[in-house]
């Protein structure tokens, strides 16, 4: 399909409103889906709570409160499954951030997202890494992506964001919009400013940017 045909087909769509409970379910699907990057699965307790949130029985803040109480009890009996703990809390906080009506195209907001998601999970939540690292990827034949130099993480992100702020998407066709967003997302992710949680943080940052 040519760019002209693609733009034309997009313009032919009629906007419809998505029911609120469907939006809630989509937010949870995204939040839990992002945990699969680290092979994390939610607990049965979160699966119950999220359904109560989708149907409107509990707010997202009540869900987090219930989860914290649940894990305090688990900790006292030494029964915490830590992978589920991380998945449950981070998924819930992703949904919380998706519901927040705020966004700032800035390095500080990237730090804010990471700190918000991973407080109580990582002691370095919201802090840029101070060491360089590599990670062997099977998809790259055990080679590593060239992640950002730890000395210039803030500058690298600020540079990418500065370029993004100069773009006028109203002047671009749909193909160019998609290509530009893809490139921006990839550049942010490749910097990999945190020791852990980069993919989830970048994905949520871009999602908030696009809303």
Give the ranges of each region predicted by the language model.
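FIC/Doc superfamily catalytic core
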Residues: 1-211
């Amino acid at each position: 399909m040519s760019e002209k045909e693609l733009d034309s087909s997009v313009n032919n769509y009629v906007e419809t409103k998505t029911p609120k409970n469907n939006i809630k379910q989509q937010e949870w699907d995204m939040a839990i889906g992002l945990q699969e990057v680290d092979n994390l699965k939610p607990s049965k307790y979160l699966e119950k709570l999220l359904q109560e949130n989708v149907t409107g029985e509990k707010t997202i803040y009540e869900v987090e409160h219930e989860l914290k109480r649940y894990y305090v009890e688990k900790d006292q009996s030494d029964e915490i499954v830590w992978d589920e703990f991380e998945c449950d809390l981070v998924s819930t906080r992703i949904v919380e951030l998706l519901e927040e009506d705020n966004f700032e195209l800035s390095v500080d907001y990237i730090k804010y997202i990471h700190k918000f998601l991973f407080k109580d999970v990582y002691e370095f939540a919201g802090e840029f890494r101070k060491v360089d690292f590599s990670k062997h990827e099977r998809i790259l034949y055990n080679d590593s992506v060239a992640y950002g130099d730890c000395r210039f993480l803030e500058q690298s992100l600020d540079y990418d964001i500065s370029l993004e702020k100069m773009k006028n998407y109203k002047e671009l066709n749909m193909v160019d919009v998609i290509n530009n967003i893809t490139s921006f997302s990839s550049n942010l992710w490749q910097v990999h400013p945190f020791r852990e949680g980069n993919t989830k943080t970048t994905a949520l940052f871009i999602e908030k940017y696009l809303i």
